[in-house]
Amino acid sequence: MAKTIQAIRGMNDCSPTESPLWQWVEGKVRSVLQNYGYSEVRMPIVESTPLFARAIGEVTDVVSKEMYTFWDNDEQLTLRPEGTAGCVRAAIEHGWIYNQEQRLWYMGPMFRHERPQKGRYRQFHQAGVEVFGIPNPEIDAELIMLTARLWKELGIAEHVTLQLNSIGSLEARKNYRSALVAFLQQHVDLLSEEEKERLEKNPLRILDTKNQALQEVLNDAPKLLAYLDDDSREHFAQLCALLDAVGIQYEVNPKLVRGLDYYNKTVFEWVTSALGAQGTVCGGGRYDGLVEQLGGHATTGVGFAMGLERLVLLVQEVNQSIRLPSAVDIYVVYQGEGTTLAAFQLAETLRTELPQLRVMTHCSGGNFKKQFKRADKSGATLALVIGESEVQNQQVVVKHLLGGAEQQTLALDDIVDYIKNNF
């Protein structure tokens, strides 16, 4: 026997029993985004490597350690580690945002070479939203309201908490960076080698350290909010007032900075502790300089992304009220001379007349006992039975697989109306 080939570590298959929940979650995401008037876009999963280096920042962990990069002739390409950079590139390239506002969303796989763990994999899926051309804090509030509505739709609203911060302008962050570095240099003995490297290249990333001793020291560190420019401070105050007005609770977290360099002003995360250690379910913020940084006209931007693996896990963990549909509603079984043609004609008629129902035809042969066993396993509500006598009499037997109702024999011409009225 030939040696079997396994999936790549951190890149998972989605089984037939898992996919209904994924489809349900993705359907809720699409529904809420469409309800708010957002338009779907689709971008390639492979982009030019310099796109991410320029957008995300060369000293970030994502670019320096986690990207899947390869050469195609003379061009360096990367499997996308996130969606914002590609969406901005597409918007500039196709003129979607020139002198106009855009509310866009996308969904698909992303790739990062991280250590696989629960809810975090090397191939993972994100739903993302990007809004261009609206500088006001109202749109920041709308994105947060949108996500809050989605959590209600998914039945997880009681298990997520909103954390909010403002990281101000580039100039404000430079001033804060100097103060933070001066503070951390007094505690350099607590820093790991990786954190010492961050101190040199990207000190703000130390604020979300998992080092417990350092976390306690950081409680006394300078607060970024104290270094905000007036415009950022006013923007943040208006955002908080809007969230207060619509009743969305939040916690101002002065250590929240996000892991990508393109953010400014508002940053936010929805976090949960229902999956063990506190984890981020959704995160985003403003990136008002990114479009210009990637060669477009100066255009404001704000967005978020949510990890679908973690979202599916959270729904599984806390929402026990979901009733997912089975893969099959009606199972057509047949046995005997001339029954195959009749069964296939019946199944196609049902698919035409009742397109909302899922109709499966048994194609494996075998006696009725074997076929009913397969019908039960499919989760179907009804089995429609065609034998030789049913073919001769233009009839079909209706067998209820759930609920215990007695089986009935109906004329073929009546079966569509019967199912419409009773199913």
UniProtKB/Swiss-Prot annotation:
Keyword entries, A-Z: Aminoacyl-tRNA synthetase, ATP-binding, Cytoplasm, Ligase, Nucleotide-binding, Protein biosynthesis
GO molecular function, one term: histidine-tRNA ligase activity
Record's keyword annotation contains Transport: no
Gene Ontology CC entries for this record: cytoplasm
BP-aspect Gene Ontology terms: histidyl-tRNA aminoacylation
Subunit structure: Homodimer.
Stated name of the protein: Histidine--tRNA ligase
